[in-house]
């Protein structure tokens, strides 16, 4: 099977994968490795962004009092923990999205959704009178990064043979 020969196989970039057998060494050498690496290179920036958004509140919450926000210590701890709680919950739902929507499409959609909490936080921290519930909602939305991170990791692992999953992930 050759990736340049249209009749050779069905696993080509830009199309829906109908055949995917990464454990088959001939398939892996002819088509699989190139497609797996392409998907990995696309996923790395998306994973970085997801992880950064997911962990953002652990830095933001610590600095809010110095920026003039009058939240209690308890409220600050909730802001720091909310992304982890919502991310763990969203992981359940996000795991089902790759088979339903497709890996590339879901990577694009879920990564684009990270703009909502990122831009929201950018505006919210500029005004010390931002209500706590608004900040909590933004913190919960940062959990989108946790769900994205976990679903993307499981999606990428699908592309590699068992012997190479460790080095890919």
Protein language model regions, located:
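Extracytoplasmic
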Residues: 38-71
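Central cavity-lining transmembrane alpha-helices of secondary-active solute carriers
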Residues: 78-97
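C-terminal ends and interior cores of transmembrane alpha-helices
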Residues: 112-128
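Intracellular juxtamembrane helix-capping segments at the cytosolic ends
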Residues: 147-161
């Amino acid at each position: 099977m050759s990736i340049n020969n249209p009749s050779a196989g069905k696993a080509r970039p830009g199309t829906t994968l109908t055949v995917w057998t990464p454990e088959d060494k001939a398939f892996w050498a002819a088509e699989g490795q190139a497609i797996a690496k392409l998907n990995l290179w696309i996923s790395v920036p998306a994973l970085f962004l997801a992880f950064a958004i997911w962990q953002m509140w652990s830095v933001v919450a610590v600095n809010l009092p110095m920026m003039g926000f009058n939240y209690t210590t308890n409220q600050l701890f909730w802001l720091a923990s909310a992304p982890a709680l919502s991310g763990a919950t969203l992981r359940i739902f996000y795991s089902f999205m790759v088979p339903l929507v497709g890996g590339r499409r879901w990577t694009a959609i879920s990564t684009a959704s990270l703009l909502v909490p990122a831009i929201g936080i950018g505006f919210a921290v500029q005004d010390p009178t931002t209500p706590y519930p608004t900040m909590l909602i933004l913190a919960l939305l940062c959990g989108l990064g946790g769900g994205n991170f976990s679903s993307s990791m499981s999606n990428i692992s699908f592309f590699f043979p068992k012997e190479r999953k460790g080095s890919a992930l």
